[in-house]
């Protein structure tokens, strides 16, 4: 069993997709599987996914009709075999030890859910979200989930 299944819904993401996949596949935690679900892209996203799958056995690719990101995530989840699941968007980037840090923290704390610091870049400015209080105040997670890490 892989430690982490990384699920990436992909829709017309060719511009950023290679960089996104590189940040996942170059993680210090190597015991992962990447499940990329092409959600009916009209650009060359599928060809990029095929290229990565041919080069790295940790890549699993699925092609589906467009159903939106939730349908793509659910499809990926149906194929996931990892101990933990990490949802990742096709235009996101990770620091190289992000999955290892979150996995080790989850194991050590016997956590069901781990939320890490992240930055949001809207093309103009960068906003850092650093702690649970900020997430709760933004209604990103249910305010009753106080026991999460």
Predicted regions and their residues:
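Nucleotide-sugar donor-binding/catalytic module of glycosyltransferases
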Residues: 1-149
